[in-house]
Amino acid sequence: MGRKARLYCESQVYHVIMRGNNKQNLFYEDSDRYLFIRRLKKYTEELQIDVYSYCLMSNHVHILIGKANMNMSKLIQKLATSYAMYFNRKYERSGHLFQGRYKSETVDSDEYFKTVTRYIIQNPIKANLEDIRNRKDEILKKSYED
């Protein structure tokens, strides 16, 4: 029996979390992170999805997105598949890179939007991972300013 399709609303904002399988690292080098970011940018532009913030931790990723509609599943599928193929080829491995299905939470208020944005930005700082701080580069079409 297949899984139920997720229902999304175009006007809604979502906090998406993608985890490494068995808590394994998703990124070993900055070049891995840059490739993931370039692909995120490519697919969000292609599918007309807004990215408000994101954070690449060693073994998981946070992305705050809007205008997802039915394209959020397509975005994650394209992103996860293409990155896993790159990663497996580069590091001479096989099998699943990501742990099961991605998680997504509806961000249903301005206050929660602020809370999630703060969490995403502070996540690497709290984990003492200064080298992978939330990167505010060309992918951010919009940013939230207090």
PLM feature spans:
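Short catalytic/metal-binding and nucleic-acid-binding patches
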Residues: 1-146
